[in-house]
Design a protein with these regions (language model features):
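Short, well-ordered secondary-structure "scaffold" segments embedded in the functional core
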Residues: 1-224
Length: 224
């Protein structure tokens, strides 16, 4: 998949702010283990912490659950953090070669310093100028809980929608490693094609209800 230019990154950020209320966010990052049959003479290289053999799909997704970048083929035993640092996307981000827009002020904070455009990720990823991790679990406010919840929702939805459509991902996939990578890349492209053909999904009401559920849960917990 081609790396977006600055105009497309800004379009992605605008949609993220519209749908998820995360200004300057240009995507969410996560890794997914794709179950495979153990390649010959591979030892434990593909054996992951979940107890099966896999290759890692490292992906970024936009606000609507469409993939922006994909990297496929890292050993299943590697952590998301390590895969991120070694994959093409991670290398481009770490070297500031993703063509991200220049820092800009957040909405209603025009007097504050300009803020970087960023990706959201979980605790397995490094905290960088352009990568935001969840707030630590201790002493979370309602606002922080909602941010943590929303952070990786779009990429998780992308993985879920893709897996529900393409049963080959239930695995184990029994091809040569190179063919497996080709199949996974093709599935990601088809996922995006179907997503565009079907139209963008709109989930503000779902988000609002989930946010309310989180707030109610916190109120109950606080009163126990």
């Amino acid at each position: 998949m081609p790396i977006p230019d600055q105009i497309i990154w800004k379009t992605i950020a605008d949609r993220y702010n519209q749908l998820w209320n995360l200004p300057n966010c240009v995507g969410s990052i996560d890794g997914k283990h794709i179950r495979i049959k153990a390649p010959a003479n591979s030892g434990s290289s593909f054996f992951n912490y979940k107890g099966y053999f896999s290759v890692v799909l490292m992906a970024t997704a936009d606000a609507d659950g469409k993939f922006i970048t994909i990297d496929v083929g890292e050993y299943g035993r590697n952590s998301d953090g390590r895969v991120f640092k070694e994959c093409t996307f991670g290398q481009l981000l770490l070297k500031n070669k993703l063509n991200l827009p220049k820092n800009s002020c957040l909405p209603h904070e025009e007097n504050d310093p300009a803020f970087p455009y960023y990706f959201v990720a979980d605790e397995a990823f490094p905290l960088l100028d352009n990568v935001m991790r969840p707030y630590p679990r201790r002493s979370l406010t309602n606002t922080k809980i909602i941010f943590n919840y929303r952070g990786r929702k779009s990429v998780e939805c992308a993985f879920g929608m893709m897996a529900s459509k393409f049963k080959i991902l239930e695995g184990p996939i029994n091809f040569k490693t190179e063919r497996i990578e080709t199949v996974i890349k093709a599935v990601c492209v088809l996922h995006n094609f179907i997503h565009v053909y079907d139209g963008k999904y709109s989930i503000p009401q779902e988000i609002q209800q989930e946010d309310v559920d989180i707030l109610l849960y916190e109120d109950i917990e606080g009163n126990l």
